[in-house]
Amino acid sequence: IRDRNIDSWHLFGGSWGSTLALIYAIKNPSKVKSMTLRGIFLCRKFELLWFYQYGASEIFPDEFEKYISVIPQNERENLIASFYKYLTSQDIELRSRAAAAWTNWELSTSHLIKRDFNVGKSKTNSFSDAFARIECHYFINNIFLEDDFILKNVNIIESIPTRIIQGRYDVVCP
């Protein structure tokens, strides 16, 4: 983009993409003409707890049981930390099971009607391993930003035209 002398552009992002778009806009407000964001995810602690620890578990209890089944009962107080431990384990089988559980949980809850092609992705070791490890790594490290970074800096982007689209049944990014 910089090689093509594009000075500013429109951002579009959904879920994690909305997080990245907002962070980019805060760090580079003069380069953003507008934003269209769907499924807003600010990566706040309570959003992570809602989805990975409690909350969404009440809506999808059967899928949540599959998700937590790879974590021993005595290690479930902080599921993100426990998953991080298993996702970074040297034990490849343990790591693969944790990655499949993490990925299946997210893909099973990200659509109103369960999609077989999504569930199939969670059974692909290379996809699940990369998806779960990258996502969990960012979450365990607070996406490498201070708490509530986006909300604390929203004044920087208040003049950027922004459209927000939010789904009624969005469980991942309520």
At which residue positions do the language-model features occur?
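Active-site nucleophile elbow and catalytic-triad environment of alpha/beta-hydrolase enzymes
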Residues: H137-V154
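Short beta-strand/loop motif that positions the catalytic acidic residue
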Residues: I157-E158, I164-Q166
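Short glycine-enriched nucleophile-adjacent loop
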Residues: S18-P29, M35
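Conserved alpha/beta-hydrolase "nucleophile elbow" surrounding the catalytic nucleophile
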Residues: W9, G13-S15, G167
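Conserved acidic catalytic loop of the alpha/beta-hydrolase fold
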Residues: I1-H10
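A catalytic-pocket lid/entrance helix-loop region that shapes and gates access to the active site
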Residues: S30-F83
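Conserved alpha/beta-hydrolase "acid-adjacent" motif
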Residues: E146, V171-P174
